[in-house]
Amino acid sequence: MNRAQNAPQPSKLTRNLGLQGRNTFGFDASAELAYEITSAEQIPEVMESIAAQKLSWRVLGGGSNVILPKVLPGATLLMNITGAEITSSNQEHSLVAVGGGVNWHDFVLWSLDNDLPGLENLALIPGTVGAAPIQNIGAYGIEVADYIDSIEAFDAHTDSFVTLPKSACHFAYRDSYFKQHPHRFIVTKVVFKLPKQWQARIHYADLANQFAANATPCPEEIFLAVCKIRTRKLPDPKVIGNAGSFFQNPIVPNEQHETLLGKHPNLVSYPDAPGKRKLAAGWLIDQCGFKGERMGNVGVYENQALVLVNHGGGTAQDILGLAKCIQEKVRKEFGVSLEIEPNIL
């Protein structure tokens, strides 16, 4: 077979592509140059073109964890690599390879349909599979890092494809090696390691309350419970623009936690690493009176103070202005700094 027949289909290039439907805040934004990536083989040629033109670049997946400006200059790579397959299986676990552009919730559904439990606590988290490890998404007591075997990516520093084992990913709370080195890696595939000996993880308060009378729920029951809780607490981005949790839960030393607890007996917190506690950012924001408040076209969600929303017509500048007000008030009231979770592009 000749080389022309083996050559990958060229990436589709669109100029001034509207991105309002590709970011969950629903901001009216556009990409100066947008490259649609449907296979890993397209990336070297695209990156060569970007380098030749000396363009800035970034990857955009589901747009669920980003704050977009009016115009994204340079090149935007739209991650649309699909596919999911079980690559190996033994008595202990199954390895599942998933394309970076696959919708995260769709993959969770696929895993349960294929009798591969483990990810049910992460149901309904918006975004793509490729973005999940970058942020190390987590919810209801687990993180995606708990189930990752390795990650395949294009390294823009070496112009080559690499496979990073879990140990090289430096996963931490909402953090990873990929997040620490922005504009370097383009995640094309994530390999998950899902255990055959599944155990329910329902110690998180909201889930524990759901199963007070059922100590041994099945994966599907946990999946449905998580969906129910998230639907009740979090707004649907298709109805009202948002990026889910806007601030990370701050982690403080035990000494600072004890001081805060003395002043605020109802302080909500959770155990973290030895000698540290994780504070509930939503509770801090609520105590400062922001829950349900509106500032122009943006505001704080009425059912969850951790979520900032775009009521329509809002901009990145608007949402960041509101975020700054919240950060300043929380710092003044509690002496705690809140870190923004979405990436500001």
Swiss-Prot record:
Active site, UniProt feature: 174, 245, 341
Pathway recorded for this protein: Cell wall biogenesis; peptidoglycan biosynthesis
InterPro entries reported for this sequence: FAD-bd_PCMH (IPR016166), FAD-bd_PCMH-like_sf (IPR036318), FAD-bd_PCMH_sub1 (IPR016167), FAD-bd_PCMH_sub2 (IPR016169), MurB (IPR003170), MurB_C (IPR011601), MurB_C_sf (IPR036635), Oxid_FAD_bind_N (IPR006094)
Biological processes, Gene Ontology terms: cell division; cell wall organization; peptidoglycan biosynthetic process; regulation of cell shape
Main location: cytoplasm
One Pfam family linked to the record: MurB_C
EC category name: oxidoreductase
EC number: 1.3.1.98
Protein family: Belongs to the MurB family.
Chain's role: Cell wall formation.
Protein name per its UniProtKB record: UDP-N-acetylenolpyruvoylglucosamine reductase
Source organism per UniProt: Polynucleobacter asymbioticus (strain DSM 18221 / CIP 109841 / QLW-P1DMWA-1)
Gene (name only): murB
